[in-house]
Amino acid sequence: MKYRRILLKLSGEALMGERPYGIDPEVLKSIAGEVASVVRAGVQVAIVVGGGNIWRGRKEAAAQGMDQASADYVGMLATVINALTLQDAIERAGIPTRVQTAIAMQEVAEPYIRRRAIRHLEKGRVVIFGAGSGNPFFTTDTTAALRAAEIDAEVIFKATKVDGVYDADPKTHPQARRYDVLSYQDVLNRDLRVMDSTAIALCKENQLPIVVFDLTTPGNIYRVVQGEPIGTWIGQRTVENNGIPSPGELIPS
């Protein structure tokens, strides 16, 4: 395998499948099976999961006139629901899994402790981080960048419903072009909304590459961790980053 330790960022929407909300059991089973295959191949896997399949903080706050911080705390609890559900699925696939949360809830999960998380990874356990960063006004993408830096992950794999980063929304713009390679600055300058700017800045500061790939294609988690050129790679232009050559200009597919 190409990588020793990775962080997989799963959006809550990725767990919905074709449902309008909630969790699709078949999608959950598929993700768990692929994560288990990666772990059995010797890769240490940490996961940050969102909660958008249950609660959309900013959208709900705007619609109901709800305080933004309160809406964000509700969203953090939604991520814990997803984390516990994902833990159960991965353990049914045969891989021991721990959930660590940024908000204490000792009856159902461990508190987030960096050294303990790393120790779990070294023992071959999957670690799922729930409750975001524990702070309102920060996204789970920022949490992914933060936790990846803390546990010394080599890369963030951001699993989405599209096969990479485009110069426009491919759902509404059929002529949109997909980028194979981008720099952090490209993402910020072009406002490509791969992740929020705080998350991108954290990755840039820590030279932490990001790979955006399509979760809906079976086997893609295993393939992307193997190092197959799937999706869009984001990193420093001047660094080779695990054997991926630095780009000159952006290369649209």
Curated annotation (Swiss-Prot):
Keywords: ATP-binding, Cytoplasm, Kinase, Nucleotide-binding, Pyrimidine biosynthesis, Transferase. ATP binds at residues 9-12, 52, 56, 160, 166, 169. GO terms for biological process: 'de novo' CTP biosynthetic process; UDP biosynthetic process. This is Uridylate kinase. It holds the Pfam family AA_kinase. It catalyses: UMP + ATP = UDP + ADP. Pathway: Pyrimidine metabolism; CTP biosynthesis via de novo pathway; UDP from UMP (UMPK route): step 1/1. It is found in: Cytoplasm. InterPro entries: AceGlu_kinase-like_sf, Asp/Glu/Uridylate_kinase, Uridylate_kinase, Uridylate_kinase_bac. NCBIfam families: pyrH_bact.
